[in-house]
């Protein structure tokens, strides 16, 4: 019997690769997506399409009510999405307070309920400079907590924690993945803007892999 794992699946290219890596490794995947009031809700549409295509158990949980507690992020509030590379100081406005701790806590609870021993999520080195909850020390401390928070121990596993988006895409290309149903742009428009830090990092990853990004841009 295949080992069960929960994959936090946003619908973006990183978590899409993580999802497929888990399947490639023979895991029985329980995909978990969250609507936390993000303006780039199109990523959830992509997640739904992919999970149907892969016949993966998929839950989308509406936790948008927590927006009342998470003010100050351009991803959820009426604040302009900054343009430019992730290293820019302005990109800190895209931090959603305590987001990954909240999502991981819910994913761990789900893992316990379905008998999964691991929760996969797509943190990578390109996020370390801006997002504290994507750094190795955060994953380490969360794992310490997850060992004692329940009777059942659950491991948080970030397969790409030490590599960047370019390396993630390279692994996806090796797996033969099609990224046309992934969404990265932080703006909630019909086409990707190509200007926000998230878009720029994605475009750089495709360029560095000598590959063409299949999604439409403005």
Curated annotation (Swiss-Prot):
The keyword Ribosomal protein does not apply. Pathway: Purine metabolism; 7-cyano-7-deazaguanine biosynthesis. It catalyses: 7-carboxy-7-deazaguanine + NH4(+) + ATP = 7-cyano-7-deazaguanine + ADP + phosphate + H2O + H(+). Its EC number is 6.3.4.20. The keyword Zinc applies. One of its GO terms (biological process) is queuosine biosynthetic process. Zn(2+) binds at residues 185, 193, 196, 199. Binds 1 zinc ion per subunit. It holds the Pfam family QueC. CDD domains: QueC-like. One of its GO terms (molecular function) is zinc ion binding. SUPFAM superfamilies: Adenine nucleotide alpha hydrolases-like. NCBIfam families: 7-cyano-7-deazaguanine synthase QueC. Catalyzes the ATP-dependent conversion of 7-carboxy-7-deazaguanine (CDG) to 7-cyano-7-deazaguanine (preQ(0)). Belongs to the QueC family. This is 7-cyano-7-deazaguanine synthase 1. The lineage of its organism: Bacteria, Pseudomonadati, Pseudomonadota, Gammaproteobacteria, Alteromonadales.
């Amino acid at each position: 019997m295949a080992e069960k794992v929960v994959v936090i699946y946003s619908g973006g290219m990183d978590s899409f690769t993580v999802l497929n890596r888990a399947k490639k490794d023979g895991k029985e995947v329980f995909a978990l997506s969250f609507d936390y009031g993000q303006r780039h809700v199109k990523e959830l549409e992509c997640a739904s399409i992919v999970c149907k295509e892969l016949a993966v158990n998929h839950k989308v949980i509406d936790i948008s009510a927590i927006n009342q507690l998470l003010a100050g992020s351009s991803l959820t509030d009426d604040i302009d999405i900054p343009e430019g590379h992730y290293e820019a100081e302005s990109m800190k406005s895209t931090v959603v307070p305590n987001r990954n701790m909240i999502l991981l806590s819910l994913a761990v609870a789900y893992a316990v309920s379905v008998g999964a021993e691991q929760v996969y999520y797509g943190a990578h080195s390109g996020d370390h400079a801006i997002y504290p909850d994507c750094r190795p020390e955060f994953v380490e401390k969360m794992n310490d907590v997850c060992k004692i928070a329940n009777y059942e121990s659950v491991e948080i596993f970030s397969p790409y924690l030490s590599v960047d988006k370019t390396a993630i895409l390279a692994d996806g290309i090796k797996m033969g993945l099609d990224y046309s149903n992934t969404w990265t742009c932080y703006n909630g428009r019909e086409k990707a803007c190509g200007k926000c830090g998230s878009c720029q990092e994605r475009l750089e990853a495709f360029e560095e892999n000598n590959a063409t990004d299949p999604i439409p841009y403005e």
